[in-house]
Amino acid sequence: MRILILTNADIGLYKFRKELLETLCKNNKVIAAFPRGEFTEQIKETGCKYLPFEFDRRGMNPLSDFQQMRRYIKLLRKLKPDLVLTYTIKPNVYGGLACQLLRIPYITNVTGLGTSIQNGGVLSFLTISLYKLGLRKASCVFFQNRMNQGLFLEKRIVKGRSRVIPGSGVNLENYSYQTYPKGGEGFHFLFVGRVMKDKGIEELLAASRKIHKKRKDVITDIVGWSDEDYTEELKIAEEEGAIIFHGLQSDVRPFYATCHCAVLPSYHEGTANVMLEASSTGRPVITTRVPGCQETFDESVTGYGCEVKDMISLQNAMEKMLDLSSSDREMMGKAARKKMESEYDRRLVIDAYLEEIKRTKNGSV
């Protein structure tokens, strides 16, 4: 079977779907088209063939987007895939439309709602309208949480088959349980993700600075690339000793291993992968009570929740974690690991894809 994958970047495909690629490549010819990036060579090592496909993943230029759809049509005509898998909004919409025009079956993954839908207004209306067109004939639409699925069904964006999967899951072996840190120098919170407003970076910096003023031994490690310009804010917080900014790291596992608690005050997620990784490592977590985050932890069992866009609520949750004994935090981390083993094993996601691919191949659409 010839399978084509359309996505907007290599990082998500490699970090969260590498095992799926490896599984698919065993019995199929798999081709992936996306803009070249840092992880492209590693993706090729899975057995997947790479085709460069550059486009603006953030812009909303109608002419540029129309050209992207035309290029997808040209690509599909050339490759003649038996099935197309799409991820992220533009490949979902324009790849989906191209598949419809050429009558090629496709399976879509809605990895999150994104700001274009969350913020409402004209852009939200336009995005929903495009999604209705792009997902209209999908063999199956995967969602990463029930709230997103419910919204798409309520607005009749999806009328056909859909199902919820546990995000991208987590590789339990790759993110193996690590002994909770004993003693050491101070207490380390850890944020892993893009440095941008929608990830809650402003609330995190403010809360970290306030806590550090009271407790000099508490530091927040920030790991990730800066999608937006927070250079000055990061510099001020780092000079105060409240944070350490590590930038983008190719391997975040050592940071999970040495932290005492992972924090993600995100405004919205499909499923918060960093919460899965931290929990799998055996660390308690703090995250917002929003779809895609709230499902990844059990309140007071594996971590604490806070209100979205609420610095005081975040600070309270962080201080609540600090007030626990080390043994209580360790117990939380062990409970978090068990939750990942039972609910978020990446093999569950792979099995769901294999089921839908088999179903599509057999014509049960």
Roles of regions detected by a PLM:
Residues 14-19, 187, 191-210, 312:
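A conserved mid-protein helix/loop that constitutes part of the nucleotide-sugar donor-binding site
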Residues 327-343, 349-355:
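A short, well-ordered alpha-helix in the C-terminal region of glycosyltransferases
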Residues 86-92, 110:
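Short His-centered aromatic/hydrophobic patch
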Residues 299-300, 304-312, 320-326:
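Conserved acidic donor-binding segment of nucleotide-sugar-dependent glycosyltransferases
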Residues 248, 267:
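Aromatic "clamp/platform" in nucleotide-sugar-dependent glycosyltransferases that forms part
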Residues 284-287, 297:
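Short hydrophobic beta-strand element within catalytic cores of glycosyltransferases
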Residues 40-44, 210-213, 219-246:
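Short, structured helix-loop element that forms part of the nucleotide-activated donor/catalytic region
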